[in-house]
């Protein structure tokens, strides 16, 4: 955490919001350049329709030192409310977010722990050599997080714990 002014209740509030309206994901990059090789990126997103809540989330993220948030707003259908979405894509920012939220997360804790291990390993790999290929562990963690994030499926907590323990 870069700024010590952040309070514990702000972190628990943010974690509760992220448990309900957020996502931690490892996504596979698909471009013409990556067809023959693996490429992944980490993305943490938060979506909400309440502008006041979104501004509060932005304030807490800035206190953490996360300034590079992609904020967009859109109205998906004419009779729907305006939706605001943050996306955090930088590995360093995701590590900061995950490290701070994991102690307070409930439903998405196992997913966040897997993503944090992935992020930590990729940051270390960047320091070791300019080109550091993805490992089988990276592939496994991508698959695990993908399964845990399937819409409409709420994985059994025992299964989630087993997945987190294996990785």
Predicted regions and their residues:
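Internal intein/HINT superfamily modules and their associated LAGLIDADG
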Residues: 1-167
